[in-house]
């Protein structure tokens, strides 16, 4: 007889009725499983006197099947789901559809769009679904393997940092973005203002290919209307699962979920946010330098093989490819006009029309001439009006 499949079941402590129902389901699965399955929940881990996050992650490491209940988009459960996906675990998601908003909230949770769930009404219904669908029979059919196998690109585009911006551009968010931009660390930025519907494959690929992640959360009051913190908790779990360095920052007042309380720093002011991030980035720069040296040593003597399946298709946002865009940029009439213009030229166009791509290629081309000194000025949104006002002020030639 084959060894039983180990299942770890993640669920929230509240509301108590939901927690109780799931614990009864765990007991019934163990009783009726005929030795095929051993299921246990987080309350059985025995975390007294231990770091909870280590015990939870160890339990996920040891299981073959990860079951999570997303009736409520609980940040602890979402963090654990991200960790399980990164560790290539078979996932079975459940939803108590008797809760009025459960299905609607799940459908609106864009990062899991396309990932199915088992909808149940009570403990009997859930246990019956478990033995009917038999998720323990195909533990190798994982979300991670399906995403990686269906990816358009198998080239590992290594990045130093994945940065998940705050949904609202608060002063701490503006100052943190400036700090990261000035650090010189190659960064992939997930900006909700640019694109708030990146697919799960994008997050898995970019988290896997980054050394670290900075995740900036809103306080509960400002996140309530358009929830973003749940998705960010999930991505933090992905980053943890890929063994990345993770810094989570949150605007005050923010109640820290137990799972990632050790990764989180709640800031009252912008200065506190920037100070914490700057210290963390200093350590990250040293780590990236060391990893770069290791990679060069590994690559010595290795012949580069070019294959069509390794073709890198690039990012849909030019800001994420400042360093690589110049390698595949196709010159356009607008680009050539900008190089030949006598004094100045203004690009006008909607998002995605190529304004930033042209800017980077123009700067790179002009910078290749040692007679030129190129300076890119990219004001954040709130500074733009000030720049326009400055242009209207009469200044002496020296001041100009």
Predicted feature residues:
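Conserved catalytic or regulatory cores that recognize and/or transform ribose-phosphate-containing ligands
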Residues: 1-305
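Walker A/P-loop-proximal flanking segment of P-loop NTPase domains
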Residues: 297-382, 387-390
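Conserved nucleotide-sensing/catalytic segment adjacent to the nucleotide-binding pocket
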Residues: 392-400
